[in-house]
């Protein structure tokens, strides 16, 4: 299977080459069809070949063996090659997209080979002629256009990496990524150290690299984490020919009017378009001119932080439960994709963020406009992906209808937005985009397209009657011939005296006369056998034809074929009209997406009581009444409130840098939630969203780091502690004063004093060297003493309350520090056996009474092993008074009591309590 998968240098399939053999041992000669198959296969190494034969795509040799296992289909055989059976399997053409989806999901790339002529044309050339076939497309993870192969709510990016060897500054990399299903095309440059974070942000479905870079050991750890990597020959990444290839793709004479790119960016961009042309086999999907992404224009977030904060997927890999799932109120797939893009790349320019917030605020203030627009958007189709399919010849009548409906929806949305009083800048730009497509095209499509449309254009019947006179005339001829067949059936029934006689049709026999077996002999006997010609005998039926029926069939077939060809010509003409204004249609589609995101975030703000954040260029960070957006929604579904908390990491008087909060408190109290919620509030603010707080002021965060939770990485031989240290090292080495850092329990997983010393040193480094805004949660209570010597360190704790030996979590963050972690109480809540809890308490008491530096052996001697108290000691007998109290409570029926009766019962119970 490896030869088809990503991350493998492309190699031809291992089909034995025919060798000379003596006549006695010569194997059976290959058929012309199999020779054709091997020629096509050899021309497409490293790809699984879907070889069209009639209504099936057939697979042979290793392809068949791999596909059989990957798809769970039956493996059979067809003929022999060099004395060995040729493995074979197949999939129906009509279900091929489903099978392609399953193969792509497993990293298998497929070449689709179609019949390029009708079998009749091959027969006309001679008995041994083979139907001409050719590969019409190569299906790879990054070059998909079909709806059923794509996630409607996510982009499908193909990304290329070009490298320039560096000197003391290290390698520079050019990146280009495109989505041919939406025409997006973006380029940037980055350093090697920034590559992992950049790839995590873009989240490409397929990455192409040169074979030299692919084999470079320095890149191996990066490439290993990617979903699909395809190595290509170096000529694809030839910088000397990059601009020429780009100009050729976009049909321009010079790059000056297209985009200003560095040589590295142009090299990566040219590699992308070259790969697209190869996979689409000569087709050129329309792409937007390459848009250059400025370095530092978005918040840098490394892969570990994205995973820890569960931005788009939970740690279990599910969308549900992620931040994206919590805030996504969009009603279109394009809007959902744009929201995901923004969440992956928060802005770092306050003015841009402000424009997005203005758009959201406009729809917060005008609920009627917001709801009207959302109703219109629900009827707006995904125009960008419809355009992409039409541009590469894979579109159908429903894609034309999508463009028609999209233009009409744009008109409706524009009319509704026009009544807004002084629309903000972003809404004004949306209005300009919605006005670009000409209404005349929608009117033309409305006249041309029928109400009920087939999925595939070859099915015909999609052009409305009355649109084209020639088509109507041809259809009438076809339909009239069918009426003749109906009258012929009645005449034949009278002629034969067989009332059950039927004229039927199938793709093998065409039109035929069918009678039951008991009447078959009658039609095969004189005089009827002069008219009825026997064709086929089945178990219960006998089938015949007549010369008259053959003539009518030819007329029907000819008329039907002419009608279909006329419809296909009309389809091509309509498609050309749409592609001619493709830029206008794509602009309107993007306008829909922007409008959808703005109205969705406004709805979120009103539904969940979010406020507009103040975002500026300072180092401030002041959140009042902040809440975790995901946890709050989860609690709301359960009917429980979320306890809001404030956080202020802004520079204190006399200091330029932000504060470092040291957060102590027990397990389960909400420390990790508090850390995450502040990071998520900053992130939401910088994508241009309102935030879950009563007030928020955010100074731009340029890098976000999170070290919250860790797991083993056994594949790389890393323990949990090692993973934690690697992530912490990245933070200490990379965080600047504009960064926001959240760290949870640094130093756990090793000896107590080792962990404490690591956490101690990390805090000092963050305070003195990184000087960034930081939230640091810990169970090392000794660290709180650092506040005396580190002026920007602030101690905070999560409040709890003890009640009759149990701990009650209040989830309130207050100034101060905790003196204990309540680990045993949490263990009790988790259900540890009472004997274990009791033993743990006695051990803890002894440890706390001892000097921290006391010899460990002496402590063990004082705490003999297995000194577990008896069950009676752990669970003392219940007193008679307690038993009576329990019985009295059980006898109460609160639902049947008045408030006065309930109060009286409470007083009676209190009177029974012991005086002590």
UniProtKB/Swiss-Prot annotation:
PROSITE patterns: DNA_MISMATCH_REPAIR_2. The keyword Cell cycle does not apply. Gene3D superfamilies: 1.10.1420.10, 6.10.140.430, DNA repair protein MutS, domain I (3.40.1170.10), MutS, connector domain (3.30.420.110), P-loop containing nucleotide triphosphate hydrolases (3.40.50.300). GO terms for cellular component: cytosol. CDD domains: ABC_MutS1. The keyword Acetylation does not apply. InterPro entries: DNA_mismatch_repair_MutS, DNA_mismatch_repair_MutS-lik_N, DNA_mismatch_repair_MutS/MSH, DNA_mismatch_repair_MutS_C, DNA_mismatch_repair_MutS_clamp, DNA_mismatch_repair_MutS_core, DNA_mismatch_repair_MutS_N, DNA_mismatch_repair_MutS_sf. ATP binds at residues 665-672. Belongs to the DNA mismatch repair MutS family. This protein is involved in the repair of mismatches in DNA. It is possible that it carries out the mismatch recognition step. This protein has a weak ATPase activity. PANTHER family: DNA MISMATCH REPAIR PROTEIN MSH1, MITOCHONDRIAL, DNA MISMATCH REPAIR PROTEIN MUTS FAMILY MEMBER. This is DNA mismatch repair protein MutS. It comes from Bradyrhizobium sp. (strain ORS 278).
């Amino acid at each position: 299977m490896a030869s088809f998968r990503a991350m493998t240098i492309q190699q031809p399939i291992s089909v034995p080459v025919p060798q000379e053999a003596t006549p006695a041992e010569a194997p059976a000669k290959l058929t012309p069809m199999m020779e054709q198959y091997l020629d096509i296969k050899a021309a497409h190494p490293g790809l699984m070949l879907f070889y069209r034969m009639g209504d099936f795509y057939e697979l042979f040799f290793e392809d068949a063996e791999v596909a059989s296992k990957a798809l769970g289909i039956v493996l059979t055989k067809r003929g022999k090659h060099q004395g060995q059976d040729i493995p074979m399997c197949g999939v129906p053409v009509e279900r091929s997209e489903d099978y392609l989806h399953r193969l792509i999901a497993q990293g298998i790339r497929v070449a689709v080979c179609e019949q390029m002529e009708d079998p009749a044309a091959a027969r006309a050339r001679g008995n041994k002629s083979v139907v001409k076939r050719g590969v019409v497309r190569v299906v790879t993870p990054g070059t998909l256009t079909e709806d059923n192969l794509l996630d409607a709510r996510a982009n499908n990016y193909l990304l290329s990496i070009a490298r320039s060897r560096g000197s003391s500054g290290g390698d520079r990399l050019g990146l280009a990524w495109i989505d041919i299903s939406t025409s997006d095309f973006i380029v940037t440059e980055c350093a090697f150290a920034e590559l992992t974070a950049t790839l995590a942000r873009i989240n490409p479905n397929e990455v192409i690299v040169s074979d030299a870079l692919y084999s470079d050991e320095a890149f191996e750890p990066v490439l290993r984490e990617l979903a699909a990597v395809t190595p290509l020959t170096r000529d694809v990444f030839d910088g000397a020919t990059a601009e020429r290839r780009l100009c050729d793709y976009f049909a321009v004479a010079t790059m000056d009017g297209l985009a200003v790119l560095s040589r590295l960016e142009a090299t990566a961009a040219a590699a992308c378009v070259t790969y697209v042309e190869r996979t689409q086999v000569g087709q050129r999907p329309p792409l937007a001119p390459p848009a250059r992404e400025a370095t530092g224009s978005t918040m840098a977030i490394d892969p570990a932080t994205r995973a820890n904060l569960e931005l788009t997927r939970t740690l279990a890999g599910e969308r549900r439960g992620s931040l994206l799932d919590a805030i996504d109120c969009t009603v279109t797939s394009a809007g959902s994709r744009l929201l995901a893009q923004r969440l992956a790349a928060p802005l770092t320019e306050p003015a841009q963020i402000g424009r997005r917030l203005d758009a959201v605020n406009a729809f917060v203030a005008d609920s009627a406009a917001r709801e009207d627009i959302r109703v219109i958007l629900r009827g707006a189709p995904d125009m960008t992906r419809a355009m992409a399919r039409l541009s590469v010849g894979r579109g159908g009548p429903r894609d034309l209808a999508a463009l028609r409906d999209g233009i009409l929806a744009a008109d409706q949305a524009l009319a509704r937005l026009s009544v807004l009083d002084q629309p903000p800048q972003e809404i004004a730009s949306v209005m300009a985009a919605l006005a670009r497509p000409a209404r005349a095209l929608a009117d033309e499509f409305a006249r041309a397209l029928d109400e009920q449309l087939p999925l595939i254009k070859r099915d015909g019947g999609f052009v409305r009657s009355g649109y084209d006179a020639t088509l109507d005339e041809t259809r009438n001829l076809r339909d009239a011939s069918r009426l003749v067949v109906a009258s012929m059936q009645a005449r034949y029934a009278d002629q034969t005296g067989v009332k059950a006689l039927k004229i039927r049709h199938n793709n093998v026999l065409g039109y035929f006369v069918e009678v039951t077996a008991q009447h078959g002999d009658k039609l095969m006997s004189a005089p009827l056998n002069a008219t009825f010609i026997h064709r086929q005998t089945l178990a219960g039926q006998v089938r015949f034809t007549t010369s008259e029926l053959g003539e009518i069939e030819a007329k029907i077939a000819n008329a039907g074929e002419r009608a279909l060809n006329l419809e296909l010509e009309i389809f091509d003409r309509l498609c050309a009209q749409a592609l001619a204004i493709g830029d206008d249609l794509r602009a309107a589609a993007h306008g829909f997406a922007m409008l959808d995101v703005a109205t969705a975030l406004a709805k979120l703000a009103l539904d969940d009581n979010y406020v507009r954040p103040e975002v500026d260029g300072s180092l401030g960070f002041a959140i009042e009444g902040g809440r975790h957006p995901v946890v709050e929604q989860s609690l709301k579904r359960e009917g429980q409130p979320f306890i809001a908390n404030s956080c202020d990491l802004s520079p204190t008087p006399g200091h330029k840098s932000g504060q470092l909060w040291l957060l102590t408190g027990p397990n389960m109290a909400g420390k990790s939630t508090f850390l995450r919620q502040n990071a998520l509030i900053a992130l939401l603010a910088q994508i241009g969203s309102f935030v879950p707080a009563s007030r928020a002021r955010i100074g731009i965060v340029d890098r976000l780091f999170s070290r919250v939770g860790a797991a083993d990485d056994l594949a790389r031989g890393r323990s949990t502690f090692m993973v934690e240290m690697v992530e912490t090292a990245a933070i200490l080495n990379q965080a600047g004063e504009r960064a926001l850092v959240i760290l949870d329990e640094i130093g756990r997983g090793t000896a107590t004093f080792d962990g404490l010393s690591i956490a101690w040193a990390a805090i000092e480094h963050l305070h003195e060297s990184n000087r960034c805004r930081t939230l640091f949660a810990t169970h090392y209570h000794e660290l709180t003493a650092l506040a005396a010597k580190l002026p920007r360190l602030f101690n905070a704790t999560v409040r709890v309350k003890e009640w009759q030996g149990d701990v009650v979590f209040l989830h309130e963050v207050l100034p101060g520090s905790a003196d204990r972690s309540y680990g045993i109480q949490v263990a009790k809540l988790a259900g540890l056996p009472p004997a274990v809890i009791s033993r743990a308490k006695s051990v803890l008491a002894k440890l706390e009474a001892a000097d921290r530096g006391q010899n460990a052996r002496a402590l063990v001697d004082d705490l003999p092993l297995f000194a577990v108290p008896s069950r009676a000691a752990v669970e003392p007998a219940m007193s008679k008074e307690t038993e009576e109290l329990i019985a009295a409570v059980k006898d109460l029926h609160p639902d049947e009591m008045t408030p006065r009766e309930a109060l009286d019962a409470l007083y009676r119970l209190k009177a029974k309590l012991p005086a002590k």
